[in-house]
A protein has these predicted regions:
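A ligand-binding cleft/hinge motif common to bilobed small-molecule-binding domains
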Residues: 110-115, 256-279
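Periplasmic-binding protein-like
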Residues: 133, 146-149, 228-232, 274-300
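Short, polar/charged alpha-helical segment
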Residues: 36-51, 55-75, 269-272, 326
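Conserved C-terminal helix/tail region of periplasmic/extracytoplasmic solute-binding proteins
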Residues: 24-28, 32-35, 352-377
């Protein structure tokens, strides 16, 4: 046990050091080119390399790869992997100096930081054309995409939001009527639960409790974040393994009681395509859901470095992001790429959703997961 605790402490220190260094840590590694190439020179060298290998947590990479191949004549070998599979594969390959991906699109920021960035397996690269375009907060590590999960309700009986405060989700009238993807099935859901135990969000939850009930929250756990998680789960929370299935369960018409869930905002498109009744709630106190990034980074032992840089740049343009931009709830870190009609920009969601803090997640998620596993129903 002591050895395990020592290893955890050392890993946490590594991550903290990477954070303290910020862009100064990643930029020198990413800048190991002989010289800064013009766009024409980059294209020529990339075409000479002839191919690029990418691991991605999103299957839509295949559509972008096909268009990139047509445009530049560079072959793309794209593999679609689950979060954990990608992290383990890159750890094994780069750690063992085995040739694999040239760059990756990855999520689950706490694990990515602790297992891939801190050991130096991933390298931050920002295309020169994007330095003045992408907001600084999305540059290190470079965000490719932002995805949101929002409280969404069955709107057949009412068009008005069914809750205004997250503590309502712990009240008896909603027992057994709320659905959420099992945090064991997806790291970003575990990340959300972890983030609301942070000092900032625990304080906001405590304030929201007082606003709802006009009294101070009496704690039976570490803080208001843990308290909300406990009461949320103990209120008959229905855990699923698919946001698609959850959206169908919530949105199906003809239900005797109104239901709601916390799932990906992009599923609201099913309102029309699957004849469902789904509406988001965007003004819930103190949060209406959460938002998380997918990072795009080069591997430390990338072979086709110029082709990787060219493809990364392409994916950050409106043309390259097209496979993702066709739906609501998918946002490029490049704010010049238009959002879907009826959607809101990232700036709207940023003030309403819980973001990820990779360092806090890396240091605290295990404790929150253990807490959730021990909740008694």
């Amino acid at each position: 046990m002591k050895k395990l605790m020592l290893v955890s402490m050392l890993l946490a220190i590594m991550v903290a050091s990477a954070f303290a260094a910020g862009s100064q840590e990643a930029a020198p590694i990413a800048a190991q080119a002989e010289k800064v190439l013009t766009q024409e020179e980059l294209i020529a060298v990339a075409q000479a390399e002839g191919k690029v290998v990418v691991y991605s947590i999103t299957s839509r990479i295949s559509g972008a790869a096909a268009e990139f191949e047509k445009k530049y004549g560079i072959k793309v070998e794209a593999s679609n992997l689950k979060d954990g599979e990608l992290i383990e594969k890159v750890t094994r390959e780069v750690g063992g100096n085995i040739q694999g991906a040239d760059f990756v699109i990855c999520q689950d920021s706490g694990r990515v930081y602790g297992q891939l960035i801190a050991p130096g397996y991933l390298v931050n690269y920002i295309p020169p054309s994007m330095v003045s375009v992408i907001p600084p907060e999305y540059q290190n590590p470079l965000n490719f995409q932002l995805i949101n999960k929002v409280f969404i309700f069955n709107s057949e009986k009412t068009q008005q939001p069914v809750i205004q405060n997250v503590w309502e989700a712990t009240e008896p009238q909603w027992k057994g009527l709320i659905q959420f993807k099992d945090p064991k099935a997806e790291g970003v859901n575990a990340n959300f639960l972890t983030m609301i135990t942070s000092p900032e969000w625990a304080a906001r939850l405590e304030q929201a409790y007082k606003a709802r009930y006009n009294k101070k929250l009496v704690l039976t756990t570490r803080n208001a974040g843990y308290e909300w998680i406990k009461m949320f789960f103990q209120n008959g929370l229905v855990l699923g393994n698919s946001d698609t299935k959850i959206s169908e369960n919530i949105g199906i018409k003809g239900q005797p009681k109104t239901t709601f869930g916390l799932f990906v905002y992009s599923k609201t498109r099913y309102d029309a395509t699957k004849n469902l009744a789904l509406l988001p709630m965007t003004e819930v106190v103190p949060f209406s859901g959460f938002i998380y990034p997918a990072f795009i980074m080069m591997t430390q032992n990338a072979k086709n470095t110029h082709a990787a840089k060219l493809f990364i740049e392409y994916l950050l343009t409106a043309e390259g992001f097209k496979p993702w931009s066709k739906d609501v709830g998918s946002y490029s870190s490049n704010p010049t790429i238009p959002i879907n009609e009826g959607d809101h920009p990232v700036s709207f969601w940023a003030s309403r959703l819980v973001p990820e803090d990779p360092q806090f997640l890396f240091e605290n998620r295990a404790a929150v997961e253990e807490f959730v596993n021990n909740i008694t129903f």
